[in-house]
Amino acid sequence: MINDYEATRPMTTDAMPVSGEGTMDNDDVISTLNGLIETCKDGEEGFREAAAGVKNSEFKSLFADFSLQRSQFAGVLQELVRSLGGDPESEGSIAGAIHRGWIDLKTALTSNDEKAVLNECERGEDSAKNAYAEALEQALPANIRDILEQQSQSILAAHNRIKQLRDSEGHRSASSGF
């Protein structure tokens, strides 16, 4: 099993199979990885905004950690794209952010509703989970698949943590009369 350090460490090019029996074309692998880079960059920015916009110190710290994690994931994926001879994406896109579920985060932040912020972060994580699941359905080289599976597991853990916080925030609000 790959630990978090290995999931954020780029592989050397000599360990990178480009194509083989049953694996994707090199350009398709690059395209898949670039899509995940955008997903990670969108998550990085979404979590950065969430960290800056909440008052709860636990949420602020958690969102900052998730933002850093997504930045590291994107860095690993960018190195993989370079090692395959491709030009890696360097940022998310407005269209990508909308598609990936981060669009309502600013509204949630301006309302000072932490449960709404958690809902929007969870929605963003749902989109990231789906993007990784779609990528993992492809016939990727084993070394790339291993990295994506580890990153996917970390995203699932983040999603579950956010969901847990959101659910406990809902119970807290209900018990306080809000």
Q: For each predicted feature, which ranges?
A:
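Preference for long, well-ordered alpha-helical segments
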Residues: 120-178
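Alpha-helical bundle segments that constitute or directly flank the non-heme di-iron/ferroxidase center
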Residues: 21-55, 115-139
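A structural signal for well-ordered alpha-helices, especially hydrophobic packing surfaces
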Residues: 44, 74, 78-81, 102, ...
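Low-complexity, polar/amphipathic intrinsically disordered segments that mediate membrane, lipid-surface
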Residues: 2-14, 20, 24-26, 149, ...
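Alpha-helical scaffold segments that form or flank carboxylate-/histidine-based iron centers
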Residues: 28-36, 57-75, 114-118, 143-155
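Generic structural concept
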Residues: 30, 34-37, 41, 67, ...
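Carboxylate-rich helix-loop segments that flank metal/cofactor sites and access channels
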Residues: 9-17, 76-129
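Conserved alpha-helical segments that form or flank metal/cofactor-binding pockets of metalloenzymes
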Residues: 58-95, 158, 162-165
